[in-house]
Protein backbone atom coordinates (compact mmCIF):
# COMPACT_ATOMS: atom_id res chain seq x y z
CA UNK A 1 0.00 0.00 0.00
CA UNK A 2 1.30 3.40 -0.99
CA UNK A 3 -0.48 6.61 0.02
CA UNK A 4 1.08 9.94 -0.96
CA UNK A 5 -0.13 13.53 -0.88
CA UNK A 6 -0.65 14.73 -4.44
CA UNK A 7 -2.13 18.17 -3.80
CA UNK A 8 -3.32 20.40 -0.98
CA UNK A 9 -5.14 23.70 -0.77
CA UNK A 10 -2.94 26.78 -1.08
CA UNK A 11 -4.03 29.95 0.70
CA UNK A 12 -3.86 33.41 -0.87
CA UNK A 13 -3.98 35.76 2.14
CA UNK A 14 -4.11 39.03 0.17
CA UNK A 15 -7.92 39.30 -0.19
CA UNK A 16 -8.36 38.81 3.57
CA UNK A 17 -5.79 41.49 4.28
CA UNK A 18 -7.36 43.89 1.78
CA UNK A 19 -10.94 43.33 2.93
CA UNK A 20 -10.53 43.00 6.70
CA UNK A 21 -6.92 43.87 7.50
CA UNK A 22 -6.73 40.29 8.70
CA UNK A 23 -3.27 38.79 8.66
CA UNK A 24 -2.89 35.06 8.37
CA UNK A 25 0.24 32.95 8.42
CA UNK A 26 0.10 30.19 5.85
CA UNK A 27 3.60 28.87 5.37
CA UNK A 28 2.84 25.20 4.79
CA UNK A 29 4.61 22.64 6.98
CA UNK A 30 6.21 25.35 9.18
CA UNK A 31 5.61 24.13 12.73
CA UNK A 32 5.71 27.64 14.17
CA UNK A 33 2.83 28.85 12.02
CA UNK A 34 -0.40 27.22 10.84
CA UNK A 35 -0.39 25.41 7.55
CA UNK A 36 -2.43 26.80 4.67
CA UNK A 37 -5.19 24.26 5.30
CA UNK A 38 -5.43 25.09 9.01
CA UNK A 39 -5.18 28.83 8.40
CA UNK A 40 -8.01 28.68 5.86
CA UNK A 41 -10.33 26.94 8.31
CA UNK A 42 -9.67 29.60 10.92
CA UNK A 43 -10.13 32.45 8.45
CA UNK A 44 -13.43 31.01 7.24
CA UNK A 45 -14.67 30.72 10.79
CA UNK A 46 -13.65 34.24 11.73
CA UNK A 47 -15.48 35.66 8.73
CA UNK A 48 -18.75 34.25 10.11
CA UNK A 49 -18.53 36.57 13.14
CA UNK A 50 -15.91 39.03 11.85
CA UNK A 51 -13.85 38.11 14.89
CA UNK A 52 -10.56 39.15 13.32
CA UNK A 53 -9.14 40.89 16.40
CA UNK A 54 -8.52 37.64 18.32
CA UNK A 55 -9.81 39.11 21.59
CA UNK A 56 -10.36 35.74 23.27
CA UNK A 57 -6.99 34.35 24.44
CA UNK A 58 -8.34 30.79 24.34
CA UNK A 59 -9.01 31.03 20.61
CA UNK A 60 -6.36 33.56 19.61
CA UNK A 61 -4.03 30.91 18.21
CA UNK A 62 -4.82 28.61 15.32
CA UNK A 63 -4.67 25.44 17.47
CA UNK A 64 -6.93 27.08 20.05
CA UNK A 65 -9.40 28.35 17.47
CA UNK A 66 -9.69 25.07 15.59
CA UNK A 67 -9.72 23.14 18.86
CA UNK A 68 -12.82 25.08 19.86
CA UNK A 69 -14.36 24.44 16.43
CA UNK A 70 -13.78 20.70 16.84
CA UNK A 71 -15.17 20.70 20.39
CA UNK A 72 -18.37 22.38 19.23
CA UNK A 73 -18.73 20.23 16.12
CA UNK A 74 -18.85 23.18 13.72
CA UNK A 75 -17.04 21.23 11.01
CA UNK A 76 -18.33 23.26 8.05
CA UNK A 77 -15.30 25.57 8.12
CA UNK A 78 -13.11 22.52 7.49
CA UNK A 79 -14.79 21.93 4.13
CA UNK A 80 -12.84 24.71 2.42
CA UNK A 81 -9.45 22.99 2.45
CA UNK A 82 -8.92 19.76 0.57
CA UNK A 83 -6.24 17.10 0.30
CA UNK A 84 -5.68 14.87 -2.72
CA UNK A 85 -3.93 11.51 -2.38
CA UNK A 86 -2.33 9.22 -4.91
CA UNK A 87 -3.21 5.74 -3.65
CA UNK A 88 -1.55 2.64 -5.11
CA UNK A 89 -1.63 -1.08 -4.50
CA UNK A 90 -4.80 -1.27 -2.47
CA UNK A 91 -7.45 -3.90 -3.10
CA UNK A 92 -10.66 -3.61 -5.03
CA UNK A 93 -12.34 -4.52 -1.75
CA UNK A 94 -10.89 -1.39 -0.13
CA UNK A 95 -12.19 0.74 -3.01
CA UNK A 96 -15.67 -0.67 -2.44
CA UNK A 97 -15.53 0.32 1.23
CA UNK A 98 -14.01 3.75 0.61
CA UNK A 99 -16.51 4.66 -2.12
CA UNK A 100 -19.26 4.61 0.51
CA UNK A 101 -17.88 7.96 1.69
CA UNK A 102 -19.94 10.07 -0.71
CA UNK A 103 -18.03 13.31 -0.28
CA UNK A 104 -14.78 11.92 -1.65
CA UNK A 105 -13.93 12.24 -5.34
CA UNK A 106 -12.32 9.32 -7.19
CA UNK A 107 -10.38 8.69 -10.38
CA UNK A 108 -9.68 4.94 -10.52
CA UNK A 109 -7.65 2.74 -12.85
CA UNK A 110 -10.01 1.05 -15.30
CA UNK A 111 -10.26 -2.74 -15.42
CA UNK A 112 -11.82 -2.31 -18.85
CA UNK A 113 -8.97 -0.36 -20.45
CA UNK A 114 -6.00 -1.68 -18.46
CA UNK A 115 -4.78 -5.26 -18.70
CA UNK A 116 -4.60 -6.97 -15.29
CA UNK A 117 -2.96 -10.22 -16.40
CA UNK A 118 0.40 -9.41 -14.76
CA UNK A 119 -0.83 -7.89 -11.51
CA UNK A 120 0.12 -8.95 -8.00
CA UNK A 121 -2.57 -9.50 -5.36
CA UNK A 122 -3.09 -7.23 -2.39
CA UNK A 123 -2.62 -9.61 0.53
CA UNK A 124 -4.98 -8.98 3.46
CA UNK A 125 -3.19 -8.07 6.71
CA UNK A 126 -4.49 -11.22 8.44
CA UNK A 127 -2.89 -13.40 5.75
CA UNK A 128 0.25 -11.35 5.13
CA UNK A 129 3.36 -13.16 6.34
CA UNK A 130 1.51 -16.32 7.43
CA UNK A 131 1.40 -19.84 6.01
CA UNK A 132 -1.78 -18.81 4.18
CA UNK A 133 -0.01 -16.29 1.97
CA UNK A 134 1.47 -18.85 -0.43
CA UNK A 135 -1.84 -20.60 -1.27
CA UNK A 136 -3.51 -17.18 -1.39
CA UNK A 137 -1.07 -16.05 -4.07
CA UNK A 138 -1.47 -19.34 -5.93
CA UNK A 139 -5.24 -18.94 -6.00
CA UNK A 140 -4.85 -15.41 -7.32
CA UNK A 141 -2.49 -16.64 -10.04
CA UNK A 142 -5.11 -19.22 -11.10
CA UNK A 143 -7.73 -16.48 -11.31
CA UNK A 144 -5.40 -14.44 -13.51
CA UNK A 145 -4.90 -17.43 -15.79
CA UNK A 146 -8.67 -17.71 -16.19
CA UNK A 147 -8.88 -13.95 -16.80
CA UNK A 148 -6.12 -14.03 -19.42
CA UNK A 149 -7.64 -17.06 -21.12
CA UNK A 150 -11.01 -15.33 -21.20
CA UNK A 151 -9.55 -12.21 -22.80
CA UNK A 152 -7.76 -14.26 -25.45
CA UNK A 153 -10.83 -16.38 -26.20
CA UNK A 154 -13.05 -13.33 -26.61
CA UNK A 155 -10.46 -11.60 -28.76
CA UNK A 156 -10.34 -14.70 -30.98
CA UNK A 157 -14.10 -14.41 -31.37
CA UNK A 158 -13.75 -10.91 -32.74
CA UNK A 159 -14.29 -8.78 -29.66
CA UNK A 160 -12.13 -5.70 -29.20
CA UNK A 161 -9.72 -5.41 -26.29
CA UNK A 162 -12.07 -3.25 -24.23
CA UNK A 163 -15.02 -5.57 -24.77
CA UNK A 164 -12.91 -8.63 -23.96
CA UNK A 165 -11.53 -7.12 -20.77
CA UNK A 166 -14.88 -5.81 -19.60
CA UNK A 167 -16.25 -9.35 -19.70
CA UNK A 168 -13.15 -11.09 -18.34
CA UNK A 169 -12.75 -8.67 -15.42
CA UNK A 170 -15.63 -10.46 -13.73
CA UNK A 171 -13.09 -13.20 -13.02
CA UNK A 172 -10.76 -10.88 -11.09
CA UNK A 173 -10.80 -11.35 -7.30
CA UNK A 174 -11.34 -8.63 -4.71
CA UNK A 175 -7.57 -8.80 -4.12
CA UNK A 176 -6.90 -7.22 -7.53
CA UNK A 177 -4.79 -4.07 -7.04
CA UNK A 178 -6.19 -0.60 -7.57
CA UNK A 179 -4.43 2.69 -8.24
CA UNK A 180 -6.48 5.84 -7.77
CA UNK A 181 -6.51 9.54 -7.06
CA UNK A 182 -8.80 10.48 -4.17
CA UNK A 183 -9.73 14.00 -3.10
CA UNK A 184 -11.66 15.10 -0.06
CA UNK A 185 -12.06 18.21 2.03
CA UNK A 186 -10.89 18.02 5.63
CA UNK A 187 -14.39 17.37 6.94
CA UNK A 188 -14.75 14.44 4.54
CA UNK A 189 -11.40 12.99 5.57
CA UNK A 190 -12.36 13.34 9.23
CA UNK A 191 -15.49 11.34 8.45
CA UNK A 192 -13.33 8.63 6.90
CA UNK A 193 -11.07 8.58 9.95
CA UNK A 194 -13.98 8.46 12.37
CA UNK A 195 -15.31 5.30 10.75
CA UNK A 196 -12.19 3.60 9.37
CA UNK A 197 -9.54 4.48 11.94
CA UNK A 198 -11.28 2.09 14.30
CA UNK A 199 -10.52 -1.36 15.64
CA UNK A 200 -13.84 -2.63 14.27
CA UNK A 201 -13.06 -1.50 10.71
CA UNK A 202 -11.73 -3.73 7.94
CA UNK A 203 -8.01 -4.25 8.57
CA UNK A 204 -6.81 -2.98 5.19
CA UNK A 205 -8.88 0.19 5.22
CA UNK A 206 -7.83 0.80 8.83
CA UNK A 207 -4.23 0.67 7.65
CA UNK A 208 -5.16 3.10 4.87
CA UNK A 209 -6.81 5.45 7.36
CA UNK A 210 -3.67 5.42 9.48
CA UNK A 211 -1.59 6.47 6.47
CA UNK A 212 -4.06 9.27 5.71
CA UNK A 213 -3.94 10.49 9.30
CA UNK A 214 -0.14 10.54 9.24
CA UNK A 215 -0.25 12.85 6.21
CA UNK A 216 -2.97 15.05 7.69
CA UNK A 217 -0.79 15.59 10.75
CA UNK A 218 1.61 17.35 8.36
CA UNK A 219 -0.92 19.06 6.07
CA UNK A 220 -3.50 20.18 8.66
CA UNK A 221 -2.35 19.16 12.15
CA UNK A 222 -4.68 21.52 14.01
CA UNK A 223 -7.70 20.27 12.08
CA UNK A 224 -7.08 16.71 13.28
CA UNK A 225 -5.65 17.53 16.70
CA UNK A 226 -8.36 15.47 18.40
CA UNK A 227 -7.69 12.30 16.39
CA UNK A 228 -6.05 9.52 18.44
CA UNK A 229 -2.69 8.08 17.45
CA UNK A 230 -4.13 4.59 17.96
CA UNK A 231 -7.36 3.47 16.27
CA UNK A 232 -10.64 4.38 17.94
CA UNK A 233 -11.76 1.60 20.24
CA UNK A 234 -8.23 0.57 21.17
CA UNK A 235 -9.00 1.37 24.80
CA UNK A 236 -12.09 -0.83 24.73
CA UNK A 237 -14.52 2.08 24.47
From Swiss-Prot:
One of its GO terms (molecular function) is NADPH binding. Pfam families: Thy1. Binds 4 FAD per tetramer. Each FAD binding site is formed by three monomers. FAD binds at residues 76, 100-102, 185-187. A motif (ThyX motif) lies at residues 100-110. It is an enzyme of class 2 (transferase). It catalyses: dUMP + (6R)-5,10-methylene-5,6,7,8-tetrahydrofolate + NADPH + H(+) = dTMP + (6S)-5,6,7,8-tetrahydrofolate + NADP(+). This is Probable flavin-dependent thymidylate synthase. The gene is 16. The keyword Flavoprotein applies. The active site is at 196 (involved in ionization of n3 of dump, leading to its activation). Homotetramer. DUMP binds at residues 97-100, 110-112, 169, 196.
Amino acid sequence: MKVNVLATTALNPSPLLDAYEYRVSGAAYNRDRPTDADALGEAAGRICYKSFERKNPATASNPGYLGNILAQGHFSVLEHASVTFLVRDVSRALLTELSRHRHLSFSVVSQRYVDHADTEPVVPPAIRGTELEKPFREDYAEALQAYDAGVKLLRARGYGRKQAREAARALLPNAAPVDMVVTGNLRAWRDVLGKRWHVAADAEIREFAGRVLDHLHAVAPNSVQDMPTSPFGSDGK
